[in-house]
């Protein structure tokens, strides 16, 4: 009995998987809201009774708003420092409330009509007032969602290090992809059935309210975990110091990981935001069904990410998995560049992209704790997510302007230039993943070694 009392709560499989389920549900709701507007682009740019009359440029500006505060106000970077300094419970609760608040602003914006437009400085562009209000809400939500993301990632590392770390992270990603897939597949028909864009956004906001409650449940478990860890700890852990950030900044492996994250995700998430229209204009898919093809990507990762995570836990080869996934991403986008208009090819390419999207995250996120110590993990994930958000903020703006420039007289879009850009992101990701592979050989991070001890 004494031996049992001296175990941490996280040593119980039931306890750690229950904790994982609570925080994964929170992020699943978040990912639903993140992409709930992606399949609605045809309605957003329509001038009919349920449309909002946005331009492609305005939609690109709005899509990029997710990362504006994270990138330009450094909120994500400071969020990582707050996480390491003040802990998981404080940071997680604050970030989930920020998500809900931003979602309410966005819902209010698309539920009302606004007169006039505003010209932004530095030649950014002129946008309708409604677009700016919706973008503000999305930016606030994005700051909360990214901070919640690094918090949840550190939570998983805290509870699963020495156990099924990659499988657990894969499970969390799988639930997140369920959220994304549901948004891509259901948002457009739900909005049409319920009278407009505001209905789908309102549904997402309601789910975020429930997600706050789910995180409160986790907070109770986290407090018990800390108490059990103190009971078995033989000597106090060294706390976070600002001077420790030098160790992070000078780590070449960390920078390879961060750059890989930037390039890989720049080739996936911004692509998803424009993929519905791609299916309509290039592959001739019916507008009501077009969102289902991009939805195949997250649905595929629901099964593949935990599977590849299990492979990493059991057999290792994390760096190799990242190389294969990056190469597959590049091949898929090259296929989308080619003058092939068969929707069957589009479906096959999207399935292959789903495999790539399962390979890289399943190996990348569990590899960070092998490179960075636990006391700096929040800051490390924050910096990686911050760099990722540069892509999430700027790439949609770039792609929106490229699509606007390639809009033909009949209103259709030539996607050749757009998909060439995405293919270039994939090619750079391949190069970076190879550099990480050789850096691991040199420094002995253990990226090719199994996670289960």
Q: How should these model regions be labeled?
A:
Residues 73-88, 304-317, 403:
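Helix-to-loop junctions at the C-terminal end of transmembrane segments
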Residues 318-364:
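C-terminal transmembrane helical hairpin of 12-TM major facilitator-type secondary transporters
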Residues 131, 137-175:
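Cytoplasmic helix-loop-helix junction between adjacent transmembrane helices
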Residues 166-185, 191-192, 385-396:
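Glycine-rich segments within core transmembrane alpha-helices of 12-TM secondary carriers
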Residues 97-126, 327-341:
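C-terminal ends and interior cores of transmembrane alpha-helices
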Residues 2-13, 225-257, 453:
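Juxtamembrane intracellular "pre-TM" segments in multi-pass secondary transporters
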Residues 37-41, 251-305, 395-396:
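Extracytoplasmic gate region of multi-pass secondary transporters
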Residues 199-217, 417-435:
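Symmetry-related core transmembrane helices of the 12-TM Major Facilitator Superfamily/SLC fold
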């Amino acid at each position: 009995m004494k031996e049992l009392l001296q175990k941490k709560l996280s040593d119980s499989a039931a306890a750690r998987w229950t904790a994982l389920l609570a925080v994964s549900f929170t992020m699943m709701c978040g990912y639903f809201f993140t992409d709930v507007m992606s399949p609605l682009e045809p309605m957003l740019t329509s001038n009919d009774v349920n449309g909002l009359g946005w331009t492609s440029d305005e939609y690109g500006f709005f899509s990029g708003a997710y990362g504006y505060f994270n990138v330009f106000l450094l909120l994500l970077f400071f969020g990582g420092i707050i996480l390491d300094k003040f802990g998981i419970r404080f940071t997680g609760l604050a970030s989930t409330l920020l998500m809900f608040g931003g979602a309410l602003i966005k819902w209010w914006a698309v539920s009302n009509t606004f007169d006039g437009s505003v010209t932004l400085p530095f030649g950014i562009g002129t946008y309708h007032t409604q677009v700016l209000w919706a973008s503000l809400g999305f930016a606030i939500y994005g700051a909360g969602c990214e901070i919640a993301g690094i918090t949840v990632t550190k939570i998983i590392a805290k509870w699963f290090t020495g156990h099924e770390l990659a499988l657990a992270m894969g499970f969390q990603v799988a639930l997140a992809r369920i959220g994304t897939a549901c948004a891509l597949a259901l948002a457009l028909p739900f909005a049409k059935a319920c009278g407009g864009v505001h209905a789908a956004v309102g549904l997402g906001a309601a789910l975020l309210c429930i997600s706050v409650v789910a995180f409160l449940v986790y907070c109770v478990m986290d407090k018990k975990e800390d108490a059990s860890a103190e009971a078995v700890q033989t000597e106090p852990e060294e706390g976070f110091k600002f001077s420790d950030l030098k160790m992070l900044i000078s780590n070449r492996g960390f920078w390879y990981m961060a750059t890989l994250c930037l390039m890989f995700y720049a080739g996936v998430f911004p692509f998803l935001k424009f993929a519905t229209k791609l299916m309509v204009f290039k592959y001739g898919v019916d507008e009501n069904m077009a969102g289902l093809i991009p939805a195949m990507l997250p649905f595929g990762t629901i099964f593949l990410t935990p599977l590849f995570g299990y492979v990493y836990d059991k057999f290792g080869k994390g760096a190799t998995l990242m190389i294969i996934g990056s190469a597959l991403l590049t091949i898929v986008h090259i296929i989308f560049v080619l003058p092939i208009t068969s929707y069957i090819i589009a479906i096959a390419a999207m399935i292959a992209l789903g495999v790539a999207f399962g390979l890289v995250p399943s190996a990348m996120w569990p590899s960070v704790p092998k490179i960075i110590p636990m006391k700096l993990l929040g800051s490390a994930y924050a910096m990686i997510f911050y760099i990722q958000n540069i892509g999430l903020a700027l790439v949609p703006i770039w792609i929106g302007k490229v699509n606007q420039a390639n809009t033909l007289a009949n209103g259709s879009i030539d996607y050749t230039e757009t998909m060439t850009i995405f293919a270039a992101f994939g090619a750079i990701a391949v190069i970076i993943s190879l550099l990480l592979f050789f850096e691991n050989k040199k420094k002995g991070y253990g990226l090719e070694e199994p996670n289960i001890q």
